[in-house]
């Protein structure tokens, strides 16, 4: 069928539906708000599916249900309807002889797929043993002027699914399941941290100085203050101010914004968990993370084995822990990379160029080691792995390692070759932090758009004393991708960023 023919068919069907709505208006309010349901489809199935037909009949269970008409099969003086609510689907049996006179012909006969109705009736089992509501009262609650996307195959066009998520949720059970899982991930995280004595807080989304991560920010202007402001790229510096102030365990579940590329793993607006714990180090946080992910897996999937595409991730086993240098040497040996290459700037430049990496002038040895890791090792970290000991150059907020000050007490969590989280023992030496901010300013002046801004007030806060602290950020969208087995970040964000048509 051509696009033009489809448009004509759509216009014709909408015209018929509008005529039906006009007739309803003539009778009164076509959008009543007096119906109150007392049952959801999922609960009815859970409570009564196992009952035999005679036993169910003897109980005379009366229910009120409401939802959207997804299918209908007219059979003379009766119609079978599939009703969908937020929990699932239930079958309705609407027969002329069970309704007041004239209702079946005048009302039920005017219903269309997509209409929202409320019904009252008793439960029974059909000859095929399907739980069904025998309707004795019916009411149209909302007339749908547009038809459902595809009566037989659901909504399959990917772009339409993202642009018109409401249609996707109506038509695709898998999409509804995905966002239920996402909600459970967030609820599970919140429950975990509250149970550990953490306090949930909110920090500014609009910031004078964007900090806490290396990323390009969105810029806006505050008219009343006549000052440029930034959508936050991370809440880190504000959360650590709270630890200075005496809130020793804090967490925030909220949005971050980064004015960067869009991909199957990146959206400019995304949700993060960040939490900070005083009198803890990065080893404690790795332990927390393992415990949290195991709990989420059990609560959401009922198992610590998490399927993802053709892979399976085992959250039940201890997560591997490996340093960045060791990961490069382990997976880069076949490319001829040796230990000495990672401790000498010129040798690291040579390795990077051999790997086809375009070396930036602003990079020092630490940045070179990082890009070499990304090229040769990152995609090998399939099972849950904590990557540790990142160079200080790329970790401006992390505490230096006592044994090797060139690296930091930092970790990143990788699952399926993708970074899921980032944490470290916090730098609480105000003078060291000030020097690292200055180095970031120099990098920005040298052309690094993602280098951090200097936050003088944060340095002042550190001068008042930050207790030994560790903090971590976990990407909620990427966690949701894992637990929902979703291939793209757009599949787990209700309304992802899209280019305008």
Curated annotation (Swiss-Prot):
Mg(2+) 1 binds at residues 412, 419. Binds 3 Mg(2+) ions per subunit. It holds the Pfam family tRNA_anti-codon. One of its GO terms (cellular component) is cytosol. It is found in: Cytoplasm. CDD domains: LysRS_core (cd00775), LysRS_N (cd04322). Keywords: Aminoacyl-tRNA synthetase, ATP-binding, Cytoplasm, Ligase, Magnesium, Metal-binding, Nucleotide-binding, Protein biosynthesis. Its main location: cytoplasm. Its EC number is 6.1.1.6. It comes from the Bacteria. InterPro entries: Aa-tRNA-synt_II, aa-tRNA-synth_II, aa-tRNA-synth_II/BPL/LPL, Lys-tRNA-ligase_II, Lys-tRNA-ligase_II_bac/euk, Lys-tRNA-ligase_II_N, Lys-tRNA-synth_II_C, NA-bd_OB-fold. Mg(2+) 2 binds at residue 419. Its cofactor is Mg(2+). GO terms for biological process: lysyl-tRNA aminoacylation. GO terms for molecular function: ATP binding; lysine-tRNA ligase activity; magnesium ion binding; tRNA binding. It catalyses: tRNA(Lys) + L-lysine + ATP = L-lysyl-tRNA(Lys) + AMP + diphosphate. Belongs to the class-II aminoacyl-tRNA synthetase family. Homodimer. This is Lysine--tRNA ligase. The gene is lysS.
